[in-house]
């Protein structure tokens, strides 16, 4: 292996130790695939729980990126379980529907962007499934999402779903016509890069104005010079280790304040 390759590997391993992304799952973490049905069709979520924290653990509902539920969301769920948050990664596409490229990701996410009622129904069904998992306190819930999932958790907020908090990582912020945040019941945290072309700062300002108008309890952390998908380890140059670590700490603080 070339020296450059060794240096890159060392950097990745160091980052993994800081974030926990490269660690073997601890023995006390229970993890399982969970198949559930919506309108007679199967969906496959993923559940992680740390047995060391006992029963009635606060719940995190994790919504996947536009390429569907994969190893990224599973690792994030494990990381949250290690901190004492039972985590259910919801499936919005259906069992076996896992986009393999950009075109397929656009197609699957586009179906739900175009049909918000279906998006809401699948989110609500995933939430209900998560709340009845063993060891979970279904009355203490925060929903988080990445990219497409970041937009989806804001859909949950506008729908008035009974959740204590909503966290959007590098999501998109367009509010469909006829919707607003007047029914939002929980706190909102936005974690975003200032150079995100998917949701530029004008969109951030618009979102803040909409939530202000609805008297929503919200906070925003903006990471200067940071691109879209900054927490995604496989996103190449868009990945930003510092912003990833900052946003992870912000999430843990939010969870501690909201559902601990």
Regions found by a protein language model. Give the residues of each.
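Serine-hydrolase catalytic machinery in alpha/beta-hydrolase-like enzymes
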Residues: 33-133, 230-235
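A conserved short beta-strand
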Residues: 162-172
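Alpha/beta-hydrolase fold nucleophile elbow
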Residues: 135-146
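Gly/Ala-rich beta-loop-alpha elbow adjacent to hydrolase catalytic centers
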Residues: 145-149, 153
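C-terminal catalytic histidine-bearing segment of alpha/beta-hydrolase fold enzymes
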Residues: 212-260
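Short alpha-helix in the alpha/beta-hydrolase fold that links the catalytic acid
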Residues: 76, 200-210
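Short beta-strand/loop motif that positions the catalytic acidic residue
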Residues: 184, 190-192, 196
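Short beta-strand immediately N-terminal to the catalytic nucleophile in serine-hydrolase-like folds
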Residues: 143-145, 169, 191
């Amino acid at each position: 292996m070339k020296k450059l390759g060794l240096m890159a590997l060392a950097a990745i391993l160091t980052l993994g130790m800081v974030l926990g992304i490269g660690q073997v799952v601890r023995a006390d973490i229970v993890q399982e695939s969970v198949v559930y049905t919506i309108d007679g069709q199967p969906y496959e979520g993923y559940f992680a729980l740390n047995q060391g924290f006992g029963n009635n653990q606060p719940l995190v509902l994790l919504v996947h990126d536009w390429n569907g539920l994969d190893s990224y969301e599973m690792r994030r769920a494990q990381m949250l379980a290690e901190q004492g948050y039972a985590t259910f990664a919801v499936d919005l596409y259906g069992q076996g529907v896992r986009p393999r490229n950009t075109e397929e990701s656009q197609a699957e996410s586009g179906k739900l962007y175009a049909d918000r009622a279906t998006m809401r129904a699948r989110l609500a069904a995933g939430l209900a499934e998560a709340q009845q998992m063993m060891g979970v306190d279904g009355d203490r819930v925060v929903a988080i999402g990445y990219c497409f999932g970041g937009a989806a958790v804001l859909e949950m907020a506008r729908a008035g779903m009974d959740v204590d908090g909503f966290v959007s990582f590098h999501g998109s912020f367009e509010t469909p016509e006829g919707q607003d945040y007047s029914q939002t019941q929980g706190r909102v945290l936005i974690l975003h890069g200032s150079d995100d072309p998917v949701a530029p700062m004008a969109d951030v300002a618009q979102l803040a104005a909409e939530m202000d108008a609805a008297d929503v309890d919200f906070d925003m952390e903006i990471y200067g010079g940071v691109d879209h998908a900054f927490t995604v380890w496989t996103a190449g140059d868009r990945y930003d280790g510092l912003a990833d670590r900052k946003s992870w700490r912000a999430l843990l603080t939010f969870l501690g304040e909201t559902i601990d």
